[in-house]
Amino acid sequence: MKKSYLATSLTLSIAVGVSGFTSVPAFAKTKIDYHKQWDTPQYIGEVWEPEGAKGDDVVWSYLEKYKDEFRIQGNVEDHFEIVNEARNKETDTKHYRLQEVYNGIPIYGFQQTVHIDADGNVTSFLGQFIPDLDSNKQLKKKPKLNEQKAVKQAIKDVEGEVGEKPDFIQDPEAKLYIYVHEDESYLAYAVELNFLDPEPGRWMYFIDAHSGDVINKYNMLDHVTATGKGVLGDTKQFETTKQGSTYMLKDTTRGKGIETYTANNRTSLPGTLMTDSDNYWTDGAAVDAHAHAQKTYDYFRNVHNRNSYDGNGAVIRSTVHYSTRYNNAFWNGSQMVYGDGDGTTFLPLSGGLDVVAHELTHAVTERTAGLVYQNESGALNESMSDIFGAMVDNDDWLMGEDIYTPGRSGDALRSLQDPAAYGDPDHYSKRYTGSQDNGGVHTNSGINNKAAYLLAEGGTHYGVRVNGIGRTDTAKIYYHALTHYLTPYSNFSAMRRAAVLSATDLFGANSRQVQAVNAAYDAVGVK
């Protein structure tokens, strides 16, 4: 029977027993939110006792319980794979990340999270599940294209985007998925094209495995758009390495290293490792890239116990002096790249601590929630980078103010405190719904940015009063949500759920932090 909906979802309540524990949501009923399009659960909140199941079997038993709601025929283990299990030592909770599969093929971006409290009870499910794929006969057929032909199709198309064949950083590869786009499911190859010439790009292509048509494409490259001395003349201290009589911008004390290179105004990466004879560095762009990468590493390590962007100490590599008068900084999937700016729109972009932290947070997001860089999930991707940029550079709530329009005092790229001051929405009712900027990823980030600001600082917005909880607790909530709850296609509603669940995990179901999260998202119109 088809369910009826209000707004984007319907909440179904099923009576269950009440848990007396405050470490998990105090649900008197099971709450299920259904996805508007697929009519399957996108959120389940409850306290469910597994009755003797242990380890992964808890997850499988839980999914078995809801197989009818997911419209699953047969074994649930044929429809999901457990791709990650993480234990939070602070809360003694477990967090499982799942991947939906069909005939052994992963459905691109369709991941789910299942969460287990300290007593072994399942407390929530969050994510998207697409049902009834058996009805699409094309998904059962063998691909007519092989991986090599799919790559060729993508390269041919991107040549039209950039004007010539790019010089790829690494050889492009194709991976087979089931890809859902505009209400249709396709057997498709995902092809990532990463290049620097003739212009930097990190394009994601989805090629129909039968026809060779381009189903969807978008550029994932994030644009900022808009002792030694740094770009602003400030003196910084940072770790280097000495080899013989030469000093190198190479820090071996953090993870597997932090290294800073120069492209010498060319476009080859990583370029040349920065060196000096007396360990007093005068290249401001290099000093800032190195020192700011160290500070960002220290923040995530000391505050969130994360060892580099991948959690395993990966080398943080930065290149400055990229190209000539280049007004951009970006994470290309393996390293940071900074232009020198043109002196009018931008100073050297590594001079902004919040810019460096913003870009490195993209690397963290890529290794955790994997938020797809389009539409609402892309706006959340951008917002997470803004939020942690403001947490690392914590003297204000502006982004890029140190390096943007140096001739104009008080200017910035964005504001978390007042997104509207820079043309960005501060309420869901004002969101951008067009196709520019990958569906408004830099614009609509203002909605979640405003919620984060209100959560930290408090205030009244659209008639809703929020009692702030401070930057520290706010950062803990968003980091927990990013690493444990959000999935590739999470939207704003899922962000609210993830933040509430994270605040519950960290501070308790009846805490002022949970109340503040709910108020903050009420204030920006996210239900």
From Swiss-Prot:
<dbReference type="GO" id="GO:0005576">
    <property type="term" value="C:extracellular region"/>
</dbReference>
<keyword id="KW-0482">Metalloprotease</keyword>
<feature type="binding site">
    <location>
        <position position="401"/>
    </location>
    <ligand>
        <name>Ca(2+) 2</name>
    </ligand>
</feature>
<comment type="function">
    <text>Extracellular zinc metalloprotease.</text>
</comment>
<dbReference type="InterPro" id="IPR025711">
    <property type="entry name" value="PepSY"/>
</dbReference>
<feature type="signal peptide">
    <location>
        <begin position="1"/>
        <end position="28"/>
    </location>
</feature>
<dbReference type="Pfam" id="PF01447">
    <property type="entry name" value="Peptidase_M4"/>
</dbReference>
<comment type="similarity">
    <text>Belongs to the peptidase M4 family.</text>
</comment>
<dbReference type="GO" id="GO:0046872">
    <property type="term" value="F:metal ion binding"/>
</dbReference>
<feature type="binding site">
    <location>
        <position position="411"/>
    </location>
    <ligand>
        <name>Ca(2+) 4</name>
    </ligand>
</feature>
<feature type="binding site">
    <location>
        <position position="393"/>
    </location>
    <ligand>
        <name>Ca(2+) 2</name>
    </ligand>
</feature>
<dbReference type="InterPro" id="IPR001570">
    <property type="entry name" value="Peptidase_M4_C_domain"/>
</dbReference>
<feature type="binding site">
    <location>
        <position position="393"/>
    </location>
    <ligand>
        <name>Ca(2+) 3</name>
    </ligand>
</feature>
<keyword id="KW-0865">Zymogen</keyword>
<feature type="binding site">
    <location>
        <position position="396"/>
    </location>
    <ligand>
        <name>Ca(2+) 3</name>
    </ligand>
</feature>
<feature type="binding site">
    <location>
        <position position="405"/>
    </location>
    <ligand>
        <name>Ca(2+) 4</name>
    </ligand>
</feature>
<protein>
    <recommendedName>
        <fullName>Bacillolysin</fullName>
        <ecNumber>3.4.24.28</ecNumber>
    </recommendedName>
</protein>
<feature type="active site" description="Proton donor">
    <location>
        <position position="442"/>
    </location>
</feature>
<keyword id="KW-0732">Signal</keyword>
<dbReference type="InterPro" id="IPR023612">
    <property type="entry name" value="Peptidase_M4"/>
</dbReference>
<feature type="binding site">
    <location>
        <position position="276"/>
    </location>
    <ligand>
        <name>Ca(2+) 1</name>
    </ligand>
</feature>
<dbReference type="GO" id="GO:0004222">
    <property type="term" value="F:metalloendopeptidase activity"/>
</dbReference>
<keyword id="KW-0378">Hydrolase</keyword>
<dbReference type="InterPro" id="IPR050728">
    <property type="entry name" value="Zinc_Metalloprotease_M4"/>
</dbReference>
<dbReference type="InterPro" id="IPR027268">
    <property type="entry name" value="Peptidase_M4/M1_CTD_sf"/>
</dbReference>
<dbReference type="Pfam" id="PF02868">
    <property type="entry name" value="Peptidase_M4_C"/>
</dbReference>
<feature type="binding site">
    <location>
        <position position="404"/>
    </location>
    <ligand>
        <name>Ca(2+) 4</name>
    </ligand>
</feature>
<dbReference type="InterPro" id="IPR013856">
    <property type="entry name" value="Peptidase_M4_domain"/>
</dbReference>
<feature type="binding site">
    <location>
        <position position="382"/>
    </location>
    <ligand>
        <name>Zn(2+)</name>
    </ligand>
</feature>
<keyword id="KW-0964">Secreted</keyword>
<keyword id="KW-0862">Zinc</keyword>
<feature type="binding site">
    <location>
        <position position="278"/>
    </location>
    <ligand>
        <name>Ca(2+) 1</name>
    </ligand>
</feature>
<feature type="binding site">
    <location>
        <position position="358"/>
    </location>
    <ligand>
        <name>Zn(2+)</name>
    </ligand>
</feature>
<dbReference type="Pfam" id="PF07504">
    <property type="entry name" value="FTP"/>
</dbReference>
<feature type="binding site">
    <location>
        <position position="401"/>
    </location>
    <ligand>
        <name>Ca(2+) 3</name>
    </ligand>
</feature>
<feature type="active site">
    <location>
        <position position="359"/>
    </location>
</feature>
<feature type="propeptide" description="Activation peptide">
    <location>
        <begin position="29"/>
        <end position="223"/>
    </location>
</feature>
<feature type="binding site">
    <location>
        <position position="362"/>
    </location>
    <ligand>
        <name>Zn(2+)</name>
    </ligand>
</feature>
<feature type="binding site">
    <location>
        <position position="394"/>
    </location>
    <ligand>
        <name>Ca(2+) 3</name>
    </ligand>
</feature>
<feature type="binding site">
    <location>
        <position position="354"/>
    </location>
    <ligand>
        <name>Ca(2+) 2</name>
    </ligand>
</feature>
<keyword id="KW-0645">Protease</keyword>
<dbReference type="GO" id="GO:0006508">
    <property type="term" value="P:proteolysis"/>
</dbReference>
